[in-house]
Amino acid sequence: MDIVSLKFIGIGFMAIGMYGAALGVSNIFSSLLSAIARNPSAAENLQRMALIGAGLAEAMGLFAFVIAMLLIFS
């Protein structure tokens, strides 16, 4: 295998990181909706924590995207 084919295999593996971020964000918000349905009085605190968690999970996907772009254009 040459270096170009290995580069594109690495880019494909970066897609797994973006897929994991999407699964993490969907899991966070499905749990948020379940928790708010059980205890509506805690909705404000739960929303704040869920948004922080979603931002961190989405950051991992963005890091994977940036690394994939660096691999493509390097």
Swiss-Prot record:
The keyword Transmembrane helix applies. F-type ATPases have 2 components, F(1) - the catalytic core - and F(0) - the membrane proton channel. F(1) has five subunits: alpha(3), beta(3), gamma(1), delta(1), epsilon(1). F(0) has three main subunits: a(1), b(2) and c(10-14). The alpha and beta chains form an alternating ring which encloses part of the gamma chain. F(1) is attached to F(0) by a central stalk formed by the gamma and epsilon chains, while a peripheral stalk is formed by the delta and b chains. It is found in: Cell inner membrane. Belongs to the ATPase C chain family. It comes from Rickettsia typhi (strain ATCC VR-144 / Wilmington). GO terms for molecular function: lipid binding; proton-transporting ATP synthase activity, rotational mechanism. The chain crosses the membrane at residues 8-28, 52-72. It holds the Pfam family ATP-synt_C. F(1)F(0) ATP synthase produces ATP from ADP in the presence of a proton or sodium gradient. F-type ATPases consist of two structural domains, F(1) containing the extramembraneous catalytic core and F(0) containing the membrane proton channel, linked together by a central stalk and a peripheral stalk. During catalysis, ATP synthesis in the catalytic domain of F(1) is coupled via a rotary mechanism of the central stalk subunits to proton translocation. Key component of the F(0) channel; it plays a direct role in translocation across the membrane. A homomeric c-ring of between 10-14 subunits forms the central stalk rotor element with the F(1) delta and epsilon subunits. This is ATP synthase subunit c. GO terms for cellular component: plasma membrane; proton-transporting ATP synthase complex; proton-transporting two-sector ATPase complex, proton-transporting domain. The record marks E58 as: Reversibly protonated during proton transport. It is a multi-pass membrane protein. PROSITE patterns: ATPASE_C (PS00605). HAMAP family: ATP_synth_c_bact. The gene is atpE. Keywords: ATP synthesis, Cell inner membrane, Cell membrane, CF(0), Hydrogen ion transport, Ion transport, Lipid-binding, Membrane, Transmembrane, Transmembrane helix, Transport. Its main location: membrane. InterPro entries: ATP_synth_F0_csu, ATP_synth_F0_csu_DDCD_BS, ATP_synth_F0_csu_sf, ATPase_proteolipid_c-like_dom, F/V-ATP_Csub_sf.
